């Protein structure tokens, strides 16, 4: 069995178990965090997918916490399908792991083999390629939040450096077909930061342009606006996949839970990265 060892523990998040738990709690209770508990509401609504940032926890942790706390208000998922960009271009253009475990300072989380293999069978672009995940942080930084808030749940990791609209549509449709009838048990996580390395006001303005298209569940419009205004979204393929998946599942609403930039947490406003947590509901 393959165990994917942590690559960014001690850099993007605390390397010790106690330190990491405290950092997750800090993210939740931070002035930019959700500050709320996850008492499951007694209604039939649930979260289909979320868009979550993936920077170091000291920068984006409070924004990321909004997404996971929101999920926990409605459901306790059994599986998280986590899709992120391949920042390093290592390995296959589209990669998945269909077996094994992922390790963090909080322990190991299992890959859901059934769901992963069914998705891979429907999307021929996806290669079984653990090498593509070895250095990549976009999936890894999501895992501790899932382990801490949803113990016992499993994951399906997917990374893309092929981020075309075509692949995103096919992947979103395939996940919908695999999950059909089980949406309340599965959440799709699109791991992405928004605009990069521009002043706080510029980043905020650019982010809001693409967020508007996301809230309209318009993947093509999102891509067009991103290109037109040079918004340097790193995980745009993951975001488009979540939009398509949610629409295929009959999403009845989308909500911007929180937006901030690294300047809001660090105080340095000259070169910032944008972060948003967004939830799609049914």
Curated annotation (Swiss-Prot):
Gene3D superfamilies: LigB-like. Coiled coil: none annotated. PANTHER family: PROTEIN MEMO1. Belongs to the MEMO1 family. This is MEMO1 family protein Cmaq_1590. It comes from Caldivirga maquilingensis (strain ATCC 700844 / DSM 13496 / JCM 10307 / IC-167).
